[in-house]
């Protein structure tokens, strides 16, 4: 399902700030697998996820996902196949947009978007139903700006958004690290 073959990435090449972030990294992940990458700060865990997500292009090697060679695909194209939740609960959402608008964007990820209304009656009903599965009472607050929510609520919504279209791969980058213990427990429960 995911095959990473010999990828390498060096930042700031030929400068005093040159950093070899990834060197000849390879792994195979079968469909339905769950992989945890453990390492010290600065060891390249987030960099590896960024490489898979397409935040930057790797210097060498290849990345294949669900039978597609995605090594040179831009990030927005990979978004059709990859859902992602960042460590910072404020990174996965647009704070000035409503909960409904954020979710509508997630529901249309990977498709062309026109300038018409993102949330109509049929979409609103689906949003409400899915948000209610979080058991946080947010289904009654769909018009609230997402920026007014707690970190735990935002992270739960980000997880819902990342998994909305059943991605081939879901990347979770220390997705509970910035949360209080109660919120972290709620988000971990949703992850399962």
Predicted regions and their residues:
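Conserved ABC transporter NBD signature motif
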Residues: 61-69
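Q-loop/switch helix immediately C-terminal to the Walker
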Residues: 96-112
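The feature captures the beta-strand-to-loop junction immediately N-terminal to the Walker
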Residues: 38-40
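Walker B catalytic motif
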Residues: 174-175
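ABC ATPase NBD coupling module
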Residues: 69-83, 91, 113-120, 124
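Helix-to-loop junction immediately C-terminal to a conserved catalytic motif
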Residues: 53
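ABC ATPase C-loop
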Residues: 162-163
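A short, flexible loop at the N-terminus of ABC-type nucleotide-binding domains that lies
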Residues: 1-4, 10-24, 36, 74
